[in-house]
Design a protein with these regions (language model features):
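Class I S-adenosyl-L-methionine
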Residues: 1-83, 178-179, 185-187
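Fold-independent oxyanion-binding glycine-rich loops
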Residues: 4-6, 23-26, 58-59, 88, ...
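Short gly/pro/ser/thr-enriched loop/turn and capping motifs at secondary-structure boundaries
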Residues: 8-11, 28-29, 88-93, 115, ...
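Short, hinge-like loop/turn segments at secondary-structure boundaries
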Residues: 19-21, 98-103, 171-173
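Short, well-ordered secondary-structure micro-motifs
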Residues: 33, 66, 95-96, 138, ...
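A generic secondary-structure signal
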Residues: 43-46, 97, 142
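A contiguous loop/helix-start segment that scaffolds small-molecule binding in enzyme catalytic cores
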Residues: 49-53, 120-204
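Class I SAM-dependent methyltransferase SAM-binding "motif I" and its flanking Rossmann-like core
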Residues: 55, 59-128, 177-179, 195-196
Length: 204
């Protein structure tokens, strides 16, 4: 059993019941996440050629888990049998916790890809990987190009983990002032806005 990361509260329960290998060391070897995802995928596929294994990730394996997509592609190339088992995603947990219907529409974005992403203010948005104040500050500045500074956003921590989950509503300009809220369990929910700032060709 291999875990992409053991930086998740539920892993404490696993420690008491099963033996596993954490792949957090890959994050220390590479400079960017794309390299990390690729290296982890290569490692898992190579191990899969030698023996049956389980590769576990937090939440749903097809939601914001790039390693799974890379592994799937490599398995097809190498004729390795792969079984992807679904689970509740953090997106499901967030919407349930916030009391919002995802059928109203939403967009899922990665904080590290925000510069290249199209920000659609007319739909609800969830932004992942906001795990420290520096990233939060960059996200704030990017969003302020598209939203009003007074736009209300919600910092969500540990959605779906009852003993840890919290939600804090703040104005967009205040986002990076709440340093204690940012960790590997933090995501940002940005409700759709009626106001539009015309800053890009897409907005015209």
């Amino acid at each position: 059993i291999f875990l992409r990361t053991e930086k998740h509260p539920t892993v404490d329960q696993l420690k008491q019941q099963i033996d596993y290998t954490s792949l957090d060391s890959f994050y220390e070897k590479e400079e960017n996440f794309e390299e990390v995802y690729g290296q982890i995928a290569q490692f898992i596929v190579q191990k899969g050629k030698e023996e049956d294994l389980v590769f576990a990730v937090p939440g749903h394996p097809r939601v914001a888990e790039k390693t799974v997509g890379i592994i799937e592609g490599l398995c097809k190339e190498n004729n390795i049998e792969l079984d992807i088992i679904p689970s509740m995603s953090f997106v499901d947990a967030m919407y349930n916790y916030l009391g919002v219907d995802p059928a109203e529409g939403f967009k899922l974005l990665d904080a590290f890809e925000l510069e290249e992403s199209y920000i659609d203010t007319s739909t609800n948005t969830i932004i992942t990987q906001i795990y420290d104040p520096f990233i939060a500050s960059n996200v704030k500045l990017k969003l302020m190009e598209h939203y009003d500074d007074e736009q209300e956003v919600c910092i969500v921590v540990g959605a779906g983990i009852k003993e840890l989950e919290s939600k804090t509503y703040v104005k967009l300009y205040e986002l990076d002032r709440h340093q204690e809220l940012f960790s590997y369990l933090t995501s940002l929910y940005v409700p759709r806005s009626e106001k539009k700032l015309y800053n890009t060709v897409h907005d015209l």
